[in-house]
Design a protein with these regions (language model features):
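Short, surface-exposed recognition loops or helix-turn segments adjacent to catalytic cores
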Residues: 4-5, 55
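Active-site core of glycosidic bond-cleaving carbohydrate-active enzymes
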Residues: 12-364, 371-373, 382, 391-397
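C-terminal accessory/binding modules appended to enzymatic or scaffolding proteins
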Residues: 376-378
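C-terminal beta-strand-rich structural cap/linker in extracellular carbohydrate-active enzymes
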Residues: 381, 390-395, 400-416
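Short edge beta-strand/loop segments characteristic of extracellular beta-sandwich folds
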Residues: 384-386
Length: 416
């Protein structure tokens, strides 16, 4: 199993592991654990919700649930679809995915928004309010519905795919209530039909990856996410001021019992930053919105974690453990988004290369695939590919069949 760190978190968490899995699929030639962990954690309760951690005392006692963790788990199943196209495994896992998305469907209001969810709605260790209907939960559920529909259709089940897309369309209509037209952003929560002013990077990113924000809004949402002048480090663990990097603010879930403290920051102007774990969603949203050239500089935020411990990434920007697997998103991003190499699930043995060099002049890496390792180098105006096996490579309008041991150049590709 994937565990988050060698100290207190030696548990098989259901949601955290999505980052660990993506690191494995991106950098490791042995995908056995990346394949196994989603199966290990596919142990739904009688109501369809997954335990927040499995194979231990948390699952045994069923002390609580983290609803959003099940949605990250769905994404890990979709990762298996994209990287392995393993029909047998996906056929076994898809009924569990269906039960997860159905669990949220059963807890929606008249507008199709999940509302007042039970358990611990964690999001991450940032101060993201989750009362009533929550933008981040809605966006993650939207992503899960789209992923379930895609995998169902791929397996030949058009009926379930249509069902999921109908739910998604209803959700997208209801999600409009979370749009603040005066500030041109999504707020975190809708309580008793009223938008509360708090907002976050999480809300904007989830709206994009969940397919809930109209495309014409995406550039504005990227601005909200990336505007350093308005971003704030805020955590419920510290109710009276910022939880900046280096403050060693203690983590704490006391708010689960006493409720969220009222915001101390300027909720009309400031946007709560995502912690390292949720940044994988933020970065996916930025790339999906066509702003991937920003990513190389955004990854420099991890310098704060290296200042705290030069050998590993810590749990949050402000404290917690000094070694936490869920904070390792840059390792994935440098391959998937900056180098831009990802598999084509619909054409086994093929790679899609969509680089985002940003401020870098070049990037080069050995990338594991289901058939073997491929070396890719990206420079301004040129992509070079070399493999020990035959592979089809596509980049924009350029494509090539790379033969074993032969270096192939894709010169016409425009690199941004």
């Amino acid at each position: 199993a994937y565990v988050d760190c060698p100290t207190r978190e030696q548990r098989a968490w259901t949601g955290d592991s999505v980052v660990h899995q993506m690191i494995d699929l991106t950098t490791n030639t042995d995908w056995s654990l990346a394949r196994w962990h989603p199966q290990l954690t596919a142990t739904p309760r009688s109501d369809g919700m997954l335990p927040m951690a499995v194979a231990g005392e948390i699952e045994h006692t069923d002390i609580s649930i983290i609803p959003d963790w099940a949605l990250h788990w769905v994404h890990s199943v979709h990762n298996l679809f994209r990287y392995t196209a393993d029909r047998e495994t996906l056929t076994r896992l898809l009924p569990v995915v269906e039960r997860v998305v159905q669990w949220f469907a059963e807890r929606t209001d008249e507008h199709g928004l999940p509302v007042d969810l039970p358990g611990w709605v964690l999001i991450d260790w940032s101060a993201v309010h989750s009362d009533g209907a929550n933008s981040t939960i809605a966006g993650l559920w939207g992503r899960s519905l789209l992923e379930f529909a895609e995998m169902s259709e791929w397996l030949g089940d058009g009926g379930r795919a249509a069902w999921a897309r109908q739910l998604h369309a209803r959700l997208a209509d209801g999600f409009e209530q979370l749009w603040d037209p005066e500030r041109s952003l999504y707020v975190d929560t809708l309580v008793d039909g009223r938008r509360r002013p708090m907002t976050s990077q999480h809300a904007q990113a989830a709206a994009i990856v969940g397919g809930l924000a109209p495309r014409e809004r995406w550039p504005r949402l990227v601005e909200v996410i990336c505007d350093e002048t308005n971003l704030v480090h805020a955590a419920f663990a510290r109710a009276d001021g910022p939880s900046d990097p280096g403050t060693e603010t203690e983590l704490g879930g006391v708010y689960m019992y006493i409720g969220h403290p009222e915001p101390w920051w300027d909720t009309e102007r400031q946007v709560v930053r995502a912690q390292p774990f949720f940044r994988y969603v933020v970065h996916d949203a930025i790339v999906l919105a066509g702003a991937g050239s920003r990513l190389s500089r955004l990854l420099l935020d991890w310098r704060a974690l290296l200042d705290r411990c030069s050998a590993s990434f810590g749990e949050t920007w402000y404290g917690g453990t000094t070694c936490h697997g869920w904070s390792s998103t840059p390792t994935r991003d440098l391959i998937q988004h900056v180098l831009g190499v990802q598999p084509d699930a619909y054409e086994p043995g093929s790679l899609v290369i969509a680089p985002n060099l940003g401020h870098l002049d070049w990037i080069e890496a050995d990338v594991p695939t289901i058939d073997g390792v491929v070396r890719v180098r990206v420079e301004r105006g040129r992509i070079t590919v070399r493999a020990d096996h035959q592979v089809h490579v596509r980049s924009g309008s350029d494509s090539a069949h790379v033969m074993p041991g032969v270096t192939t150049v894709l010169p016409r590709t425009i690199i941004t």
